[in-house]
């Protein structure tokens, strides 16, 4: 039984290592919405032309972004930001763990969306994010933070993207 859990953990770790971006600077967290399922969220900042975007990627066993998702952010100073987005990609990875004569499937779904954000809204993120809600299926992803985990880091990623563009 001990080897069973070790095998499952190794397969899951390999799935996450294989699907995670290696060169992108991201900020993220893992969240268990229900007792049986959870998700891993990663956020990064990119600049395309003159627009800035927050790229959000969810890895889960069943959660996907809608075609036109919405991200609602509440800062620790009480400001509420609503960002409109669009689905830009998705996929799944499947593997199996062999236990005796049985194969236990392990599937991970990956869904990515981009949300347009202004420099003024990035300035508000410097106050820290206390709550984030993303419209997804089969249920919305909502996470409340007691202390900031992603707000200041997203703001710093914005400053890096801005400096990279200006220092060309």
Model-derived regions, located:
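Generic marker of residues within folded, mature protein domains
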Residues: 14, 46, 61-63, 73, ...
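An ectodomain-focused feature that recognizes extracytoplasmic/extracellular
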Residues: 25-75
């Amino acid at each position: 039984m001990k080897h069973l859990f070790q095998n499952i953990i190794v397969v899951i770790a390999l799935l996450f290592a294989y699907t995670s971006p290696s060169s992108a600077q991201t900020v993220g967290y893992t969240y268990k919405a229900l007792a049986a399922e959870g998700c891993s969220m990663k956020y990064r900042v990119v600049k395309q032309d003159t627009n800035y975007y927050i790229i959000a990627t969810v890895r889960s066993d069943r959660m996907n972004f809608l075609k036109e998702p919405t991200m609602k952010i509440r800062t620790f100073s009480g400001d509420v930001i609503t960002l409109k987005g669009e689905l830009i990609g998705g996929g799944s990875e499947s593997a199996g763990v062999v236990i005796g004569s049985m194969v236990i499937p392990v599937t991970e779904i990956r869904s990515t969306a981009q949300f347009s954000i202004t420099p003024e809204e990035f300035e508000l993120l410097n106050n820290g994010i206390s709550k984030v809600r993303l419209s997804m299926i089969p249920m919305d992803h909502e996470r409340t933070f007691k202390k900031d985990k992603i707000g200041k880091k997203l703001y710093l990623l914005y400053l890096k993207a801005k400096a990279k563009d200006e220092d060309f």
